[in-house]
């Protein structure tokens, strides 16, 4: 909730009239972002510094607030790190989900929006991919996302009166809120290109390096589907509204959040530079 994607989701939810409760252990985020969310929206939210694996803490929060729905964003997310420390990723990402689902059941909270990833598709044979494509994650991070998707599908099938879920498969979030008050500012080494671009732009880095020049693309650099983080945030609002609609039957529905169009890293850097310095 206090991270890059979560803070933008908070803005969208508050502006839509939702009361927001954020649970974040701040391992790779800052409570300052939530102060800025309140500054942007003119509204306050409830914040608890806690880990989603702490069942007692979650029970206390659910007992304090009348929770109607959960957006689950918590988890480790670096592909390379997941390959180096797979057990840490399986323990953290799966355990947090198990505890959260148990507490939701205890307090009869039915609606669940899950922050999944396009990594569940592995290396698809063709592009763009749609939600009917086979899933085949190729790294521990992606496998944790796929496992959680399958767990949710099993739970909805077994107890449709107790759980409905939307699985949002992100492609590559980029950008920031138009105010400039919140954006992607990782405390650790960035996991993607865009923080390097912005850090170079403001002088944190002397130069920008784009790795890879032999891909089968127009300019030889990798191609990715970038989606603006505010569009991604609005996707969560739409998922929540859809789940809370009285017309919605119990479900476990996967939805891709992307543009369906790839852009090479070199072209992406060029566009970013033009927008910042034109």
Predicted regions and their residues:
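Phosphate/oxyanion-binding loops and surfaces in catalytic or ligand/nucleic-acid-binding neighborhoods
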Residues: 40, 158, 173-177, 199-207, ...
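Short-chain dehydrogenase/reductase
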Residues: 90, 138-146, 183-195, 225-226
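C-terminal substrate-binding subdomain of Rossmann-fold SDR/epimerase-dehydratase oxidoreductases
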Residues: 193-274
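Catalytic core of nucleotidyl cyclases, primarily class III adenylyl/guanylyl cyclases
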Residues: 179-181
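N-terminal Rossmann-like NAD(P)+-binding domain of SDR-like oxidoreductases, especially those catalyzing
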Residues: 1-176
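Short capping/connector residues at structural and topological boundaries
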Residues: 39, 84, 125-126, 134, ...
């Amino acid at each position: 909730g206090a991270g890059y994607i979560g803070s933008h989701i908070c803005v969208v939810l508050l502006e839509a009239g939702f009361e927001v409760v954020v649970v974040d252990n701040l391992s790779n985020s800052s409570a300052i972002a939530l102060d800025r969310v309140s500054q942007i929206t003119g509204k306050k939210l409830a914040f608890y510094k806690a880990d989603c694996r702490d069942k007692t803490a979650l029970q206390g929060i659910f007992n304090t607030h009348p929770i109607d729905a959960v957006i689950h964003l918590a988890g480790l997310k670096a592909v390379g790190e997941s390959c180096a420390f797979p057990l840490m990723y399986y323990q953290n990402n799966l355990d947090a989900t198990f505890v959260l689902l148990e507490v939701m059941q205890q307090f009869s909270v039915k609606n669940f929006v899950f922050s999944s990833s396009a990594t569940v598709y592995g290396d698809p044979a063709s592009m763009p991919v749609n939600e009917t494509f086979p899933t085949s994650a190729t790294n521990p991070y992606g496998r944790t996302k796929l496992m959680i998707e399958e767990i949710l599908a099993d739970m909805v099938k077994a107890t449709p009166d107790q759980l409905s879920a939307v699985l949002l498969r992100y492609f590559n979030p980029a950008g920031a809120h138009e105010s400039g008050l919140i954006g992607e500012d990782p405390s650790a080494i960035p996991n993607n290109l865009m923080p390097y671009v912005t850090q170079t732009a403001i002088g944190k880095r002397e130069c920008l390096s784009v790795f890879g020049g032999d891909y089968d693309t127009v300019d030889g650099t990798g191609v990715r589907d970038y989606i603006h983080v505010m569009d991604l945030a609005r996707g969560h609002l739409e998922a929540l509204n859809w789940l809370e609609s009285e017309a919605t039957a119990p479900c476990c529905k996967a939805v891709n959040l992307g543009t369906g169009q790839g852009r090479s890293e070199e072209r992406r850097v060029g566009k970013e530079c033009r927008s910042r310095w034109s």
